[in-house]
């Protein structure tokens, strides 16, 4: 679909990182933007910044894991602007799980699934029927990750499982939209191709009490800066992709009607080929054994 001034874009996880970058890009193209995030102070700051730049903004505190709150977000967006043309289900969290899978706390899985999987489904259910009924061109972008969306990083297995689910959900959504002959498209986003400076590393700051850790962590949470410093001390330079480049990539992908919003990357291509070859040859997933798991 063609992005045009006056259209409306809804972005979850919009207070920072990729979500805020997408909102800024849409606003720069003249779209009205609806920002949703669970973090109120950061959301207010993001909305104020966009308004200062001349954007038309509606901001709402939303926990995407709560179906009722996402339905209320849709009601508010349609009441305020009368239409929604672009939906970016972008909110996501890292689970904070430690150790082997059988050592994980159930709450790590429950929280990650509530936001990363149920949050995407809630967005689809709240907005897509109205977008189809409107009959205007529209597009849905669901944020996945190379971790899980392509192949799992075993040291972050909970996150990987949720992001694999997002890929399959979006493939199914694409097929359902085609079956309805809808003018609404769908894409799955793999942010990158390199590391990104986002708040995902500090997801625990927004962890709700209902999914509190049952026991103290064996190691303290590390910020992105701490991890980057540790990598440098180990002699490994980390390359980063600016979130603004991701936002540009999304806007270009929507305009081109691309399903796979997967930036070119030799590393990603190797993973895809290795996993596909393993399946086609009915071979064990040896490509996972190269990861350090301790």
Predicted regions located by residue number:
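The beta1-alpha1 cofactor-binding region of Rossmann-like NAD(H)/NADP(H)-dependent oxidoreductases
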Residues: 40-41, 61-72, 106, 143
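Catalytic loop of short-chain dehydrogenase/reductase
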Residues: 141-165, 170-171, 175-179, 192-195, ...
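Substrate-binding pocket helix/loop in short-chain dehydrogenase/reductase
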Residues: 98-101, 105-110
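Conserved amphipathic alpha-helix within the SDR
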Residues: 47, 51, 57-61, 67-82, ...
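SDR active-site lid
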Residues: 179-261
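Active-site loop of short-chain dehydrogenase/reductase
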Residues: 6-7, 56, 83-84, 131-145, ...
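Canonical Rossmann dinucleotide-binding motif of NAD(H)/NADP(H)-dependent dehydrogenases/reductases
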Residues: 2-34
């Amino acid at each position: 679909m063609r992005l045009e001034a006056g259209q409306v874009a809804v972005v979850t996880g919009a207070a920072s990182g990729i979500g805020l970058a997408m909102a800024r890009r849409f606003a720069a193209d003249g779209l009205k933007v609806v920002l949703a995030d669970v973090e109120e102070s950061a959301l207010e700051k993001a909305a104020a910044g966009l308004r200062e730049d001349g954007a038309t903004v509606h901001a709402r505190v939303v926990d995407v894991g709560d179906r009722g709150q996402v339905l209320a977000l849709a009601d508010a967006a349609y009441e305020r602007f009368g239409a929604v043309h672009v939906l970016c289900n972008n909110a996501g969290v890292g689970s904070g799980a430690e150790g082997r899978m059988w050592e994980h706390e159930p709450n790590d899985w429950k929280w990650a699934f509530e936001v990363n999987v149920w949050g995407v489904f809630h967005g689809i259910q709240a907005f897509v029927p109205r977008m189809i009924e409107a009959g205007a061109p529209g597009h849905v972008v669901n944020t996945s990750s190379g971790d899980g969306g392509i192949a799992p990083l075993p040291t972050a297995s909970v996150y990987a499982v949720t992001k694999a689910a997002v890929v399959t959900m979006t493939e199914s959504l694409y097929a359902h939209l085609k079956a309805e002959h809808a003018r609404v498209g769908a894409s799955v986003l793999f942010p990158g191709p390199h590391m990104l400076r986002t708040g995902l590393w500090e997801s625990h700051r927004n962890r709700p009490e209902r999914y509190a850790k049952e026991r103290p962590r064996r190691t303290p949470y590390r910020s992105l800066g701490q991890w980057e410093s540790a990598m440098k001390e180990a002699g490994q330079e980390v390359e980063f992709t600016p979130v603004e480049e991701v936002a540009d990539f999304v806007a270009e992908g929507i305009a081109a009607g691309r399903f796979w919003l997967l930036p070119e990357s030799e590393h990603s291509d190797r993973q895809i080929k290795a996993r596909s070859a393993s399946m086609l040859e009915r071979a064990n997933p040896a490509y996972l054994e190269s990861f350090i798991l301790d």
